[in-house]
Regions:
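Short, well-ordered loop/turn and helix-capping segments at boundaries between secondary-structure elements
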Residues: 8-12, 125-128, 143, 147, ...
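Acidic, glycine-enriched loop/beta-strand segments at the rims
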Residues: 80-83, 89, 134-138, 146-183
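A glycine-rich phosphate-binding loop feature that marks nucleotide/adenosyl-phosphate handling sites
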Residues: 20-28, 141-142, 161-165
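Active-site neighborhoods of metal-dependent hydrolases
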Residues: 1-130
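Short, solvent-exposed cationic patches
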Residues: 214-217
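C-terminal cap of metal-dependent C-N hydrolases
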Residues: 90-97, 102-103, 165-212
């Protein structure tokens, strides 16, 4: 229903787009509005779909008692919630108006593997399996978000653009981040250049001081 709404807006000339990541669970703080009254009914689930990412209950699925205790005493605690449907995520990632996003949240190295794994995972599990073409995947990771944010010097290889380049092996690239080890680097990404400077080699950071944050658009 949501994607049909996006299609309707786009057909009427509105620049509507959205992003998605290639995982079937989301992550947020246990105190977020996502878990406000009615969430169990909305997701048609029980408390055991929620896994705690940190603290004394790290790695455990919730009971009602644990959920209420942590939400009351530590609302910032990160969780992973296993309620997303594979068919819905796959449909979204094949939609022409959807960009790839990591939506990365990390707290002391704990959190969701999407922060480290989204981009190599898309190439491994969607391109190599034929769900997306390599062109489509690269576009939704580069040109689409750059265009959406108005970053005219980003997202493409052309004269005058910033020399931000990722060199990867499409046959080897894959993610290794898991819900137990969410920061594990992938493989098959040989080089990353930011502004023409080497930032990473073989999925390992060489320089972490390159680039700059986008404060205002």
């Amino acid at each position: 229903a949501f994607l049909r709404m996006v299609d309707s807006y786009r057909m009427n000339g509105l620049r509507v787009s959205c992003d998605c990541y290639p995982y079937y669970a989301f992550s947020t703080a246990i105190g977020s509005t996502t878990y406000d009254e009615g969430w169990l009914e909305r997701y048609h689930c029980g408390y055991d779909v929620v896994e705690l990412c940190e603290g004394r209950y790290k790695g455990r699925r919730c009971t009602r008692e644990i959920f209420e205790e942590v939400r009351r005493d530590w609302p910032e605690c990160l969780t992973v919630c296993y309620v997303m449907q594979e068919s819905d995520v796959d449909m979204a990632l094949r939609h022409p108006g959807v960009m790839l996003g990591s939506d990365g949240i990390m707290n002391g190295g704990q959190g969701h593997p999407r922060a480290a794994g989204s981009f190599p995972r898309l190439l491994a599990q969607f391109v190599r399996t034929g769900k997306l073409s390599l062109y489509e995947a690269v576009r939704m990771m580069t040109a689409m978000p750059a265009d959406k944010l108005g970053l005219s010097n980003k997202g493409s290889l052309q004269v005058g653009a910033d020399a931000d380049v990722v060199i990867f092996d499409p046959d080897r690239v894959r993610d290794h981040a898991t819900f137990d080890q969410p920061t594990s680097p992938g493989e098959g990404i040989d080089y990353v250049f930011i502004g023409g400077e080497l930032a990473a080699r073989d999925c390992r950071v060489v320089r972490g001081d390159l680039g700059r944050s986008v404060r205002k658009l």
